[in-house]
Each structure stands twice: as C-alpha cells, then as structure tokens.
C-alpha cells in the first residue's frame, strides 16, 4: 500500500480499501477542504483529520466505529440523571458555537483547526453539516456536530461543559434521527467514551456497504430544520 497524493484538478479519491494499515486508515494527502471535495470524500467513507502544521490528511480506518441507533446503551446512572436533569436540546441553532466549543475542548492537540472550522461552516451553509446543542439556563453546555449522508450520519466531534451534556446530546439526537428514518451513526474511531454509549466496531467493507445502502435514501421531511428536540425517552 502507498499514500496517495490528491490532485488539485480532480475530486477523485482512491479506493478506501487501499488505505494504510499503519497508521490505520491513512489514505491520501493534499487537495483542499472545499464543499465539493468534502462531499466527494464522505460519499466514499473518507474524512479529513490532521493537526496544525500538517498537510491535509484523509482517512478511512479499518475497523470503523459505528452506532446502530437502536443499540445505544444508557447506563443506570444516566437513567437516573434523565429523571432530574435541567437540559434541553436543539438542532442547528448554533453550529458555529458548537464547532468552536469542540475545538476548544481538544485544544491541547486539536485536529479542529481554523481550516476545519471554516470548511465545515461552509458545509453547514450548504445543508450537509449539522449541530446539536444542549442548553442549561440558556447557556450552551454541550453538543455535537457531523455530516449527513442520507439515512446515515457521520459524527465528527462532541463537547461537554458539564456532566452528561454530550451524552444527552447524543441521546436526543439518536431519538430524533430514528424518528425521521435514520439508520446508522458513524463514529469513525472507537474510544472509551463512545464505547460506553454502545458504539462498536465493524469491518470497513461492511461500513462501506452500509454507506452505499443508506446514503442515497432521504430521511423524512423536517429532520434537519432548526428546532427543539424532544426529551429522550427510555
């Protein structure tokens, strides 16, 4: 396997199955973060991930971390929390605030650079990137953002300024997504936090099959309109 150099004259990506094993999933370098290129990348299960000072790096890891929405795990402590919380969640009400908060949360080694923020803001304005906000006393305390691919949602990052806020964002979103016909949430790479929520790993080829199956099927009307999300029910 070799690392591919993207052409500035073409939006074409190499086959994700040609990604390197070490580092896991690294596929290509270069190109840009235009809306057109990001759309082309997500259609093939590829996403950008790089640190300040690095060139743009494109990834498609194997295995892939995913959440089948009906397999979301809610811990006993979270169930107790949901009975007494003071949160409410919204959709697409404060995208810029959410992505900046995600960048700040990971400031010690963030991959959410100013380039990424600008690119995903344009993707949001194009109707492809979306945010979930969690509020407490009218203050933004948690949230997440990602990219929709039909009935599949590619989660990018989440943040929490108080206990359980990011978990609440995911709970409220997955309920909303299922209600509107969503089938799969892509979490890219497994970590301890997402594993505790029921995220699991599947082989890349199975993920790509799921992507092909769901990305050209639309969710129900109204799914991505700015709105308040319903309380999570268990």
Swiss-Prot record:
Major place of residence: cytoplasm
GO terms of molecular function: leucyl-tRNA--protein transferase activity
Compartment(s) of residence: Cytoplasm
Signal peptide: none
Keyword annotations: Acyltransferase, Cytoplasm, Transferase
Transmembrane segments: none
GO biological processes: protein catabolic process
Keyword rRNA processing part of the UniProt annotation: no
Reaction(s) this enzyme catalyzes, per UniProt: N-terminal L-lysyl-[protein] + L-leucyl-tRNA(Leu) = N-terminal L-leucyl-L-lysyl-[protein] + tRNA(Leu) + H(+); N-terminal L-arginyl-[protein] + L-leucyl-tRNA(Leu) = N-terminal L-leucyl-L-arginyl-[protein] + tRNA(Leu) + H(+); L-phenylalanyl-tRNA(Phe) + an N-terminal L-alpha-aminoacyl-[protein] = an N-terminal L-phenylalanyl-L-alpha-aminoacyl-[protein] + tRNA(Phe)
A GO term from the CC aspect: cytoplasm
This enzyme's EC code(s): 2.3.2.6
Broad enzyme group: transferase
Function field: Functions in the N-end rule pathway of protein degradation where it conjugates Leu, Phe and, less efficiently, Met from aminoacyl-tRNAs to the N-termini of proteins containing an N-terminal arginine or lysine.
NCBIfam families: aat (TIGR00667)
HAMAP family attached to this UniProt entry: Leu_Phe_trans (MF_00688)
Protein family (similarity comment): Belongs to the L/F-transferase family.
Annotated protein name in UniProt: Leucyl/phenylalanyl-tRNA--protein transferase
Organism whose genome encodes this protein: Pectobacterium carotovorum subsp. carotovorum (strain PC1)
Lineage: Bacteria, Pseudomonadati, Pseudomonadota, Gammaproteobacteria, Enterobacterales
Gene: aat
């Amino acid at each position: 396997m070799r690392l591919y150099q993207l052409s500035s004259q073409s939006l074409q990506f190499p086959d994700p199955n040609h990604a390197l094993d070490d580092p896991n999933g690294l596929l290509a370098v270069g190109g840009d973060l235009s809306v057109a290129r990001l759309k082309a990348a997500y259609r093939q299960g590829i996403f950008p991930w790089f640190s300040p000072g690095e060139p743009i790096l494109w990834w498609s890891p194997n295995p892939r971390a995913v959440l089948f929405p009906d397999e979301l795990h809610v811990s006993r402590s979270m169930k107790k929390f949901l009975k007494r919380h003071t949160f409410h969640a919204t959709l697409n009400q404060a995208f810029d605030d959410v992505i900046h908060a995600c960048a700040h949360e990971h400031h010690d080694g963030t991959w959410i650079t100013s380039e990424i923020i600008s690119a995903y803001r344009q993707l949001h304005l194009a109707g492809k990137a979306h945010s979930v906000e969690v509020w407490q006393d009218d203050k933004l305390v948690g949230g997440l953002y990602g990219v929709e691919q039909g009935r599949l949602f590619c989660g990018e990052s989440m943040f929490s300024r108080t206990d359980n806020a990011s978990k609440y964002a995911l709970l409220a979103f997955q309920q909303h997504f299922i209600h509107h016909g969503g089938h799969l949430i892509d979490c890219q790479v497994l970590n301890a936090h997402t594993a505790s929520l029921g995220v699991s790993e599947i082989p890349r080829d199975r993920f790509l099959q799921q992507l092909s199956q769901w990305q050209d099927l639309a969710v129900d009307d109204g799914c991505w309109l700015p709105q308040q999300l319903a309380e999570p029910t268990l």
